[in-house]
Amino acid sequence: MLISILIAGDLVPHERTVPLFEAHKTDYLFGDILSLIRESDFSVVNFEAPIVLDKLTPIRKSGPNLYSSLAAMEVVKDAGFDMITLANNHFRDQGQSGVCNTLSCADSIGLNYVGGGKNLEEARKINYQRIKDKIFAFINVCEQEYSIAEDEYGGSNPYDLINIHHDIIEARKRADYVILIIHAGIEHYP
């Protein structure tokens, strides 16, 4: 039995695409790849920009402070993505409120997520999914920059080789397959 899982890279509503996300122009935004997303048995995308519901609350950091909206997340779900990854270098760009808004919006529209949480324990949670009678464990981590969760505040699951090792061992107890998604690299270099 063939199982198709699509894992896409960074999704950031930015500049000229913001009005398209706000207007829910899913077909226009995704074009020809929309059928690939929807025909996959399971699809995942990195939701790079935290959701702002009221006002911007940017943290102090080097580089841009990204943000998005509930409409952007609704477009992601409408496109057919089953899960978003949150372990990335921008998840805490809008502080704790951006983290909490993103998590609560995903919960409210029924969109699965992995790699982010209201604290480190939540951010490290493995996401288990049944896909065609097989259990998949998804683990998502990122480099330790400005977005990392701690015991007392939310953010992303940090890239920690010891924790990853233990998480994979734990995931293998319950899952047929383990998928580790790592968000890393130098900005603007593929």
Residue ranges with predicted function:
Residues 10, 45, 86, 90, ...:
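Divalent metal-coordination and catalytic microenvironments
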Residues 13-16, 51-54, 89-103, 120-125, ...:
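Active-site environment of divalent metal-dependent phosphoester hydrolases
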Residues 18-31, 66, 130-180, 186-189:
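Binuclear metal-dependent hydrolase catalytic cores centered on His/Asp/Glu-rich metal-binding motifs
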Residues 34-38, 43, 77, 103, ...:
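Surface-exposed amphipathic alpha-helices with a cationic face
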Residues 55-77, 177-190:
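Active-site-proximal segments of metal-dependent phosphoesterases and phosphodiesterases across multiple
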Residues 83-138:
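Active-site-adjacent helix-turn-beta-strand microarchitecture at beta-sheet edges
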